[in-house]
């Protein structure tokens, strides 16, 4: 098949591109030979013929080409996009006999403008990716200002990379990507990496090579533009990067440069100058195109190949937006979706209404959404992904008070619409702030320049070092304040009659009691409201305000250790009391995390919202005995009914992510998108029919899921425990599970589900929508009037009469010629027919009025039908509270089922007994297992703290690697499991409630914070000493080892003494055996050690000593730490170990002599009454001294 090929990029003539880029003084007219495209609809043989037209070059000579294998697309449905990168192929030189090139003559450089394009059904499901396009609608070239009416659609063929395997290896260029972009790097840094690699590395994987010299990389025009060079680049206000107010999100593009561009190219540069830190997915017809530096990103990150032409250009079809944007967002990029918001006809009409310049004569395009990891919203083009973790956006506002700070915080999950606000005082270590980011780790941090103290900036650099950061204005008209935030919310969302009742409870609490309009902030929450304003500002900047704010659910954030001070009215969503687990404890005990953590061990949840609830339980275990007991009983009952448990887990397994589905359906039904004139309300989507299908299919999947959940009351109708009854039974049976039958019945009968799933259009049933029913009633009434009038006319003419005509010429009276003489002046002749049955057609004032009424009724019906899907989603969202209550019940059931599943897998399990009113805090553990360890190889341990026979503080000694740290972690994790209500792996467990767990485990410095190992230890210990209560559990591992022995011993002894006086449950491990001597008779302290068995201990050669670890907690102290055994296990040379042993013996002897001497001196003091006893003691000490060999 003969086919002319277009040399232009997107239909742009090569000469035009040369003209507009040649105006840049740095432009170099390098010739690029375009690669061959094939029609995606062409037959296989036709594609091979086109491929064969590209010759191979061998030793400078052309040779016949063999048919190339079918090209495998860079990213396909059955290959994970995030997998190994495909090697890119270079553009090969073409022969003189290549097909004749066709050059379109147009003023616009971007093709594929919107038109009357009707996609084929097969195309709609195509998710393949080309280097630019597969098939497009009529281009803007066809819709130029001279010819606004679209021409006949032509195909745009797909680029083929003719990298034949038979080509000599000497002519192949390996194109393996070597760029590693750190998550959190700015767009400019990433772009700089791309460009610098392009200039410096001839084997850079994304550079299209010059056909005259395969070893010379092409430098794209955008890489040579003067205003993009590092020493020239400025923001839109003309500020250089070293300016304190430099805005990295904008770019200064010279007006002279813009004026030399074509309308379409200028349109791209204008959008890019306002969003320089974004990758623009620029809609051109049916495709999203990436130009210039964005094309580099597409090639490097998405596996695209460059389109032919003089500037960098790549792209993909509209249907692949979700996949491509997800890949870039996950890699730390910001993606701006640019849509066409008018058709060529609309553009023509617009140009007629204004005095249009040449730059006005291009279809309008607008940014509809900017997406990064913290602003993900699941709209019609974005599917809900498999990740269940929330993606929080965090804003922090600080008031520096010298040695400490007051923080206002707002963190939100845009995918669900959860807004958390709070304000609190913090200590100099920022403990509460660290706990917040540990419990709710953000993916995006909003930062007001120069508004944070050094200690807070240090947290941002270290703890939040790997996440995205976005600046928010601190001054100027866009600066946020509490007053501005309340004013904006009042004007857009909560104004109107009864506005006091419109405000959410949390926001009402943050307003001044003296201002009934709600525009004055409470002094205690000014910082929190300012943080909320910063989040709203950024959401608005990303075009998400009407999508996120209307579904916002506000919750008060109170630091876990401050819950007791929370007002009941505003803390109603919080549990009465929780255990506090700070950032250090979460990390040291590995409570949360994807691998080898307590969360990953216990997580057998079937639903994503269940997984999120389990995460919340583990971060905030309950301190309410009644809550814990209810959970224990429910888990026990689930364990005793394994059949029902597996049935319910099978029921829950296929459930969608209902929480995100609710937010998505709310977005689909949100009329404020149109009311607030959001660009998405004007966007022209070529796959809109497919999106409508997907919307309805997803909606019906949600309805099916809720329908399936209505089986739960029947499945658990015989349950006995209080909690299971509450979360599975209907209100009439004493439960809290909502009765959804009425709502589900309505949506089941409102429309034909099968037809809607196939067509993407709702065919409503009577009673579904009042406005639709009213319109249909109006149509029915007009039809009755038409019938009545027709009967009257038949009586008048004395014959049978029918209506004739269609559309605007309907309802003409078709009167036989033989009776037409009875028509008087009130009848208007509209036409007549000849032949066997001649007739005349008349209209009257009555028929014209009936036609007008019918058209009005039909217009109303069509308007309702067009908006019917949105109204259906809106009705669903109106019952949000019921759906959410059902989700909460199911989430609790899922977590309980997960804990029951875990318990069923353990060899040993028990139900902990918790005591809330104990006189003395205690813990009794018998044969306990580490919950994350393999029980078959783990040695169980038991201990007692705070009982009648044992003191609350255990001074723990034992050999190196003997299991001291493991025991401490085991105790901490088992206590957490006990207080979330789980059954724990132990023979038995009894304890009083723990209000907080403190840990000081491991040895590590903090280089980024400038903290040494010892300073880190002391900071963590200081926190313990300040905040521990008698109900806390303290786990301290080898405190003092980071400094000199005597300093460390003294600090450790002082801390032990403090904790012993506090009488909190403590495990204090140490290798300082002087502490044992100091506290060995102290009744406040219990001595314990990790048992071991030693062979050849008295041997003079330490390398012959063998230590067998028994990993068993035993009463009493361990005489030494057996460090030489650890050295032997580590493979140290035996000579070094022996020499160390000799030195150790000498040091021990010196220390012992000093100790004995001190006792002799003490023994000689005193009066005559004790002289005899002291003389005897002195004789014993002298004997010991003689035994010391130095």
Swiss-Prot record:
UniProt feature, compositional bias: Basic and acidic residues: 38-49, 56-65
Domain of life: Eukaryota
Positions with a binding annotation for ATP: 958-965
Name of the protein described by the UniProt record: Probable DNA mismatch repair protein Msh6
InterPro entries assigned to the protein according to its UniProt record, in alphabetical order: DNA_mismatch_repair_MutS-lik_N (IPR007695), DNA_mismatch_repair_MutS/MSH (IPR017261), DNA_mismatch_repair_MutS_C (IPR000432), DNA_mismatch_repair_MutS_clamp (IPR007861), DNA_mismatch_repair_MutS_core (IPR007696), DNA_mismatch_repair_MutS_N (IPR016151), DNA_mismatch_repair_MutS_sf (IPR036187), DNA_mmatch_repair_MutS_con_dom (IPR007860)
Quaternary structure (record): Heterodimer of Msh2/Spel and Msh6.
GO molecular function: ATP binding; ATP hydrolysis activity; ATP-dependent DNA damage sensor activity; mismatched DNA binding
A single cellular component GO annotation: nucleus
Function of the molecule: Involved in post-replicative DNA-mismatch repair.
Lineage: Eukaryota, Metazoa, Ecdysozoa, Arthropoda, Hexapoda
Biased composition regions of type Low complexity, renumbered to the chain: 159-168
Alphabetical list of SUPFAM superfamilies matching this protein: DNA repair protein MutS, domain I, DNA repair protein MutS, domain II, DNA repair protein MutS, domain III, P-loop containing nucleoside triphosphate hydrolases
Phosphoserine modifications at: 8, 22, 24, 95, 97
Tagged with keyword Cell membrane: no
Cystine bridges: none
PROSITE patterns: DNA_MISMATCH_REPAIR_2
Species of origin: Drosophila melanogaster (Fruit fly)
Record keyword DNA damage present: yes
PANTHER family: DNA MISMATCH REPAIR PROTEIN MSH6, DNA MISMATCH REPAIR PROTEIN MUTS FAMILY MEMBER
Similarity comment: family membership: Belongs to the DNA mismatch repair MutS family.
Region (Disordered): 1-174, 230-249, 824-843
